[in-house]
């Protein structure tokens, strides 16, 4: 677990690094960032202390992916959405329930010890009647995951027990069909709602985005895109970002992608979010769950 530092230190770190580099940096959904070790890839896991109060500036030790210019999700509409927590109430990544005892998240969200919260709408630690709490007992990143290249950015997490299916907690199917340009999708998460400032929402945020052609994706990020990724966004500057990493991209009722990485600051014109392309991994997901159940 990374050591918590004052929030101003991380803001100052990000600003100084940006000035020194003189270029726009890429944001990952959750690697720890340190001023002692500047990197061209800025992590975007949230590590927000939920006890600090929803909507306040981050009390975190790294950056995190978030929903920029989204809106409050309707309650009970994202029952597969999970929060990965460090300590009692520190959000660091999103995840998706894909099986009664298994989650998918981004491989760069891997931690040794963490808790999982499902069925919760607010970012606050206050108990909600639909919530279910779990321990993550096994994390299995894809064997082809590479950092900082971000290829194959997915990981399976086994829960310590099966979920109790309710209106607030249920799995979603992973799509076996790859998305086409123009497909309308929805991304959700509790990540920061401003960039480069850090400001966390009170409740789960949702955003409608459109899948872009692979050419537009490659043009936006030359020599950084492969077929394990796809880009999505819109012209109005709406995007996922820090704190949303590992969260779901749902298209036509199925799980199509996971929040992976993107530009920093987020929600910049012609710099879309980049998502793990799950249609390429359905066999690995099924076989891994079967082999470890």
UniProtKB/Swiss-Prot annotation:
GO biological process: amelogenesis; cornification; epidermis development; extracellular matrix disassembly; positive regulation of antibacterial peptide production; positive regulation of G protein-coupled receptor signaling pathway; protein maturation; proteolysis
EC number: 3.4.21.-
Tissue note: Expressed in skin, breast, brain and testis. Expressed at the stratum granulosum of palmar skin.
Major place of residence: secreted
The entry's keywords: Disulfide bond, Glycoprotein, Hydrolase, Protease, Secreted, Serine protease, Signal
Record's signal peptide: 1-22
Disulfide bonds: 73-206, 93-109, 178-279, 185-251, 217-231, 241-266
GO molecular function: peptidase activity; serine-type endopeptidase activity; serine-type peptidase activity
PROSITE patterns: TRYPSIN_DOM, TRYPSIN_HIS, TRYPSIN_SER
Biased composition, class Polar residues, residue ranges: 37-49
Residues covered by the Peptidase S1 domain: 67-290
InterPro entries according to UniProt: Peptidase_S1_PA (IPR009003), Peptidase_S1_PA_chymotrypsin (IPR043504), Peptidase_S1A (IPR001314), Trypsin_dom (IPR001254), TRYPSIN_HIS (IPR018114), TRYPSIN_SER (IPR033116)
Residues of the active site: 108 (charge relay system), 153 (charge relay system), 245 (charge relay system)
Quaternary structure and interacting proteins, as annotated: Interacts with SPINK9.
General function of this protein: May be involved in desquamation.
Protein name: Kallikrein-5
Organism placement in taxonomy: Eukaryota, Metazoa, Chordata, Craniata, Vertebrata
């Amino acid at each position: 677990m990374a050591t918590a530092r004052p929030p101003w230190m991380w803001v100052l770190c990000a600003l100084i690094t940006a000035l020194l580099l003189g270029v726009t940096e890429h944001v990952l959904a959750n690697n720890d960032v340190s001023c002692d070790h500047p990197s061209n890839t800025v992590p975007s896991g949230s590590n927000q202390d939920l006890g600090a109060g929803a909507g306040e500036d981050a009390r975190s030790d790294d950056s995190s992916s978030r929903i920029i210019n989204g809106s409050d999700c309707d309650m009970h509409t994202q029952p597969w959405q999970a929060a990965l927590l460090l300590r009692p109430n520190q959000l660091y990544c999103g995840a998706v329930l894909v099986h009664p005892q298994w989650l998918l998240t981004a491989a760069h969200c891997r931690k040794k010890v963490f808790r999982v919260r499902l069925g919760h709408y607010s970012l606050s630690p206050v108990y909600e009647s639909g919530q279910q709490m779990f321990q993550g007992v096994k994390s299995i990143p894809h064997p082809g995951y590479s950092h900082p290249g971000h290829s194959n950015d997915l990981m399976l997490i086994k829960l310590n027990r099966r979920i109790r299916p309710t209106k607030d907690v249920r799995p979603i199917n992973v799509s076996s069909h790859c998305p086409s340009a123009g497909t309308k999708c929805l991304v959700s998460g509790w990540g920061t709602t401003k960039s480069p400032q850090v400001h966390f929402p009170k409740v789960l945020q949702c955003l409608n985005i459109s899948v872009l052609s692979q050419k537009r994706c490659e043009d936006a990020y030359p020599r950084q895109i492969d077929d394990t990724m796809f880009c999505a966004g819109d012209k109005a500057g709406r995007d996922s970002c820090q704190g949303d990493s590992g969260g779901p991209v749902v298209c036509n009722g199925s799980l199509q992608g996971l929040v992976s990485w993107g530009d920093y600051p987020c929600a910049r014109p012609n710099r879309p979010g980049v998502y793990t392309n799950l249609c390429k991994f359905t066999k690995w997901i099924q076989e891994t769950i079967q082999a470890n159940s």
